[in-house]
Every structure is written in structure tokens, then in C-alpha cells.
Amino acid sequence: MDNSTIVFIAVLGVAFIFLRWLIAPIPPQLPNELNEALANSVNNSNRPNNSNNSNSATNSNANRRGRREPSDDMIEVVQTIAPQLTRGQIRMDLERSGSVEVTMERYMETGSLPFPPGESAATQSYQSDISEHSQATKKEPENLIDKYDLKSKIKGDEGEGIENIDENKWGSSKEERSSLLNKKREEMILQARKRLASQLQNEVAL
């Protein structure tokens, strides 16, 4: 047997082994490996969204902590001027605005405030009926000016009867904060009285 024949047989053997390797069946472990690779790819794609959601939640919590929680005095100031509003309406708007002035301006513009989740106009009507019933049991209806003894602060121009209060000022002690809130309440009552008088004058002029 010459060398060319031996080389030819060797080439055929190598080609046969190579073809057997190509047509060999895929091992059963390979699909599992593909599934794991796909699962890892999906998890990696979801991580940025989870991170963004976490960051937005953190920012939202930080904004809420940055705003002052509305106190009962702040709610009372708004409710004395707008008694038809529920405490839930007032509290929710104060949590958003953080300011009695902004809440009152929104009420003056729209005539109402949004209801909090779980509360509706039926709740407001029920509370209004209770309020009207309790007021009817009183011997004499109480005027806000008389209730808070503001007659001495009403002058020719009602808005000048009380000093302006710095909106950014917040007392360091409980007594100082209570005093500032009382002054703010008096200021809002006098301003509301002045606006009502102006509206009545405009209606009479028309």
C-alpha cells in the first residue's frame, strides 16, 4: 500500500469523525442554560426600572418630609372662613400647599377643595347637617369678629388693622408658634371680611 492510499484513508477517517461531531444531538442541559441566560437578561433589564422607582419614591418621601405637617390651628383657620369644607378636604390641601394662604386662595378661586380618597360630597352634606343642627341649638349665632374679639382691629381700611406676618417665619417655641398662628387667623378673617364687603359693593353697583 503506497503513501497516497494511507493519506486518503486517514483523511476519510478524520472527515467521518468531524461529520459525526457536527450531527451529534444537542445535550439536554443546553436548553436549561439558555433559559437561565434569558432569565438573567430579563432581570438585568428590570433593574434600572426598579432603581428609578426607588429613586422616585425616595424623592417623594423627601418632599413630604420637607413640608410642614398641617396643625389643628391651621385647619381651624381655614374652617372658620370656609365652614362648608370638611377637615379632610382642608388637611389634604394643606399637605399639598403647606400654606394657609395658598389653600385659601385656591378655595376663593374654585369655591371648594378636592375631596380626599374615601370621602365624597355625601360625607360633606352629612357633616354640614350636623353642623347646622349644632348651630341651631345655640341661643345666638356667634360672629367671627365677636368670637375672636377683632372689633378693635377693624379700622377705616380693614386690612390695616393687623400687622403683616412673614410667611417664611416659623416660631422656635410652642408659644411663639401659637401666637403666630393666632395672628395669621386674625389676618385671614379680616381679609375675608374685606373681600366680602368689596364683592357686595360690586354687586350693588351692578
Curated annotation (Swiss-Prot):
CDD domains with a match to the protein in the record: CUE_Cue1p_like (cd14424)
InterPro entries with a match to the protein in the record: CUE (IPR003892)
Record topological domains on the Cytoplasmic side: 27-206
Subcellular location, record wording: Endoplasmic reticulum membrane
Chain spans, region Disordered: 41-73, 111-179
Residue stretches of biased makeup (Basic and acidic residues): 130-158, 166-179
Residue ranges crossing the lipid bilayer per the database entry: 6-26
Domain CUE: 70-113
Lumenal side: 1-5
Cellular component, GO, one term: endoplasmic reticulum membrane
Membrane-related topology note: Single-pass membrane protein
Subunit relationships: Forms a heterodimer with UBC7.
Stated family: Belongs to the CUE1 family.
Annotated protein name in UniProt: Coupling of ubiquitin conjugation to ER degradation protein 1
Organism per entry: Debaryomyces hansenii (strain ATCC 36239 / CBS 767 / BCRC 21394 / JCM 1990 / NBRC 0083 / IGC 2968) (Yeast)
